[in-house]
Curated annotation (Swiss-Prot):
Active-site residues, record numbering mapped to chain: 117 (pros-phosphohistidine intermediate)
Pfam families (UniProt xref): NDK
Disulfide bonds: none
Required cofactor(s): Mg(2+)
Subcellular location: Cytoplasm
Residues annotated for ATP binding in this entry: 11, 59, 87, 93, 104, 114
Cellular component GO terms held in the UniProt record: cytoplasm
Protein name as annotated: Nucleoside diphosphate kinase
One GO biological process term: GTP biosynthetic process
InterPro entries: NDK-like_dom (IPR034907), NDK-like_dom_sf (IPR036850), Nucleoside_diP_kinase (IPR001564)
Function: Major role in the synthesis of nucleoside triphosphates other than ATP. The ATP gamma phosphate is transferred to the NDP beta phosphate via a ping-pong mechanism, using a phosphorylated active-site intermediate.
Length: 140
């Protein structure tokens, strides 16, 4: 399997509970390296751009409001099969359906406040990474 990069967001419900370290430990335990990380407060424009694919969905406004409600930690993760591996580490979007030991099973409050985001494909990862990081901020 090839070395690849994926994008992660530790969402406001997790940062408000000081879970960044616990989530990072699960990421690293899975064999992924955190090659870029920063804590930011997303602007409304950033959140709307990031979630533009959901603009027509009824939950779009609520999602944007949630993502700007507090700090988030944006990350670039690297490793063999990083995209699928991180999606496995995150667990199902609905924490009640997530496997034991996954980030969402352990830490998510609800399907809406599900603690983390991860890219779903290589193309998406590249776009998402570029939205928040310049090349010199990613140190592998």
């Amino acid at each position: 399997m090839a070395i690849e990069r994926t994008f992660s967001i530790i969402k406001p419900d997790a940062t408000e509970r000081n879970l960044t370290g616990a989530i990072n430990a699960l990421i690293e335990k899975a064999g992924l390296r955190i090659v870029a990380q920063k804590r930011i407060r997303m602007t409304r424009e950033q959140a709307e751009t990031f979630y533009a694919v959901h603009k027509a969905r009824p939950f779009f406004g609520e999602l944007v409001d949630f993502m700007i409600s507090g700090p988030v930690v944006v990350q670039v993760l690297e490793g063999e099969g990083a995209i699928l591996k991180y999606r496995d580490v995150m667990g199902a979007t609905d924490p009640s359906k997530a496997a034991d030991g996954t980030i969402r099973k352990l830490h998510a409050k609800s399907i809406g406040e599900n603690s983390v985001h991860g890219s779903d494909a290589a193309e998406t990862a590249a776009i998402e990474i570029a939205q928040f990081f310049s090349g010199n901020e990613i140190v592998g």
